[in-house]
Amino acid sequence: MPEFLEDPSVLTKDKLKSELVANNVTLPAGEQRKDVYVQLYLQHLTARNRPPLAAGANSKGPPDFSSDEEREPTPVLGSGASVGRGRGAVGRKATKKTDKPRLEDKDDLDVTELSNEELLDQLVRYGVNPGPIVGTTRKLYEKKLLKLREQGTESRSSTPLPTVSSSAENTRQNGSNDSDRYSDNDEGKKKEHKKVKSARDCVPFSELASTPSGAFFQGISFPEISTRPPLGRTELQAAKKVQTTKRDPPRETCTDTALPGKGQTHKLAPGRSLFIPSESSYDRCVEKSSSPSSQREFAARLVSAAASPSLIRETTTTYSKDIVENICRGGKSRAQPLRAEEPGVSDQSVFSSEREVLQESERSQVISPPLAQAIRDYVNSLLVQGGVGSLPGTSDSVPTLDVENICKRLSQSSYQDSESLSPPRKVPRLSEKPARGGDSGSCVAFQNTPGSEHRSSFAKSVVSHSLTTLGVEVSKPPPQHDKIEASEPSFPLHESILKVVEEEWQQIDRQLPSVACRYPVSSIEAARILSVPKVDDEILGFISEATPRAATQASSTESCDKHLDLALCRSYEAAASALQIAAHTAFVAKSLQADISQAAQIINSDPSDAQQALRILNRTYDAASYLCDAAFDEVRMSACAMGSSTMGRRYLWLKDCKISPASKNKLTVAPFKGGTLFGGEVHKVIKKRGNKQ
């Protein structure tokens, strides 16, 4: 009778399967974990080494001994080839230096010598759902592990045989057990922390749109992150302590009056306000984040989270802690205006309490998922740039936001309380005519209105943020005469835009491309607004009556007038196409703003639901790609309108010129390069005409 191993775990998975098949043991369907085959080996093969009534069939050592020295299998003489190979495997396994010892066999384990992964594994074995183990939380978890080991609540029973009826369960469990550490394949030799990291790898969305035309943006992929597990006992206690430590409810912070538009509705109906300001409770927590350094910080945190989600776990709390501690050390006197309404509470006590809240939050890791935190900060900065401010649910969110509110409130110490009480300035409607101011003209008077100053400040803020995000440096123009003007932030004409303009100006008489397929509108609006207006019948009647009397008019003049009319019609068509594109981009941009607001609300209300927010951000990426392509189409239509108007002006100026019709046609359709109406072609024509004379 062949004798089998008492500890079959030393065999590889393939060897176990071959031994089971050789001894007529039915294997479960599909690929199973190694523990499954070990249990089958113990039940069907190892049990044959003993009488049927022998106890401890599934034990890993002889039944008569319980000491650790007798856990190794006893050599058996006279075994066959297969048993000899098994003993050879045992010998090789005993001398292998890369195998990790079984932590559960060590009763006198020193928790201080464990790595973060081993400490996490031990806590999981005791049924604890720990959070991230970093330098600030390791001592807490070491004490918890020692306490649990003293209570002796760890279950030392053998791994139960899982059911193999559900293929989905087998797929979920395959590759996630600890038996990979004891196998001889290459995957089993890898360290355990690599398996933990594989669950957090960045997986880009497959549905992301391609890179937009113009090479403005690079492809962006949002990683998929797993849902954060429920808070553990220590985290819940820390969260309760944070809530009880708060001494006052969150107050409305000072709003940035330089940024306009705290409204929520845009109305496109004629005669109504295009932007309606409103006073709501959502206008909170607006931080002054338009500086290049702060925007670069948000973008860097988002990129680092996408590249390595585990890195942001430590940098998030460190980032907030450094801001608060720097302000607490040097900004006591600066923050006094914000605390003026509470004379009974000293600034030092407030700062100390806020420091305790921040340190307790850092120790207990009461933070939202790293990627959600970075996305939320970045989206909030974009919303601040757009004048939306904070979103609903910000003040009633998780305690993590209290830390951010501390940073925002302390960083806004340069503002005055009176600014937050001032009503929003009224943005003038498009239908309103500005007051005339002396000889400066209506345009200058309109620019001096308070609303236009807000819009100009808003435009400067958006342009500065966009330039910083794209990494574009604005060159300062040289001072003109004795007047030194501050350089205004502005977008340069990118080479891709100039290329589109040059292509259209090379042949200004070409047929306009149709945009009806990509930007469709209703037939009624197309006929009334987008189509070139027809000449009234009454005017045509007058012209027909005057034609016989003008029969002596030169045919060249009539041809010039017709070409001029055609050029003006082409200009109208190009402008109508640009209007058609702009109407579509307006609605898509409004939808994009709503999607970003919805994603920010989801992240603020439930940070663990990052998947839904990422799906919304995926839609916003598609919308942004659409806007980029539409912008280039609008640039093309604008270039066509400029070329057509230039051709019309050429016909008008050449109408009475005494040159040949062929020369006129050549000059009117010559490529346009800007600067002068005819460019260098006029010199060639004049030179030829002089040579003929």
Curated annotation (Swiss-Prot):
Residues in coiled coil: 557-656
Residues carrying Phosphoserine: 59, 66-67, 79, 82, 155, 158, 165, 167, 310, 349, 352, 368, 420, 422
Annotated positions of the Phosphothreonine modification: T74, T153, T159, T163
Keyword Nucleus on entry: yes
Family statement: Belongs to the LEM family.
Residues with Omega-N-methylarginine modification: R85, R87, R329
Entry note about domains: The N-terminal part contains two structurally independent, non-interacting domains: LEM-like (also called LAP2-N or LEM-D) and LEM (also called LAP2-C or LEM-B). LEM-like binds DNA while LEM interacts with BANF1. The C-terminal domain forms a four-stranded coiled coil.
GO cellular component, one term: nucleus
Keyword set includes Transferase: no
InterPro entries with a match to the protein in the record: LAP2alpha_C, LEM-like_dom, LEM/LEM-like_dom_sf, LEM_dom, LEM_domain
Species this chain originates from: Mus musculus
Start and end residues of each stretch annotated as Disordered: 48-113, 148-211, 227-270, 332-351, 412-442
Gene Ontology biological process terms from the UniProt entry: regulation of DNA-templated transcription
PTM remark: Phosphorylated in a mitose-specific manner.
Identification of the protein by name: Lamina-associated polypeptide 2, isoforms alpha/zeta
Extent of motif Nuclear localization signal: 190-196
One Pfam assignment: LAP2alpha
Functional description taken from the UniProt entry: May be involved in the structural organization of the nucleus and in the post-mitotic nuclear assembly. Plays an important role, together with LMNA, in the nuclear anchorage of RB1.
Compositionally biased intervals (Basic and acidic residues): 96-105, 178-190, 245-254
Assembly and oligomerization: Homooligomer. Interacts with LMNA, BANF1 and RB1 and with chromosomes. Associates directly or indirectly with lamins at specific cell-cycle stages. Interacts with CMTM6.
Residue list for modification N6-acetyllysine: K655
Keywords: Acetylation, Chromosome, Coiled coil, DNA-binding, Methylation, Nucleus, Phosphoprotein
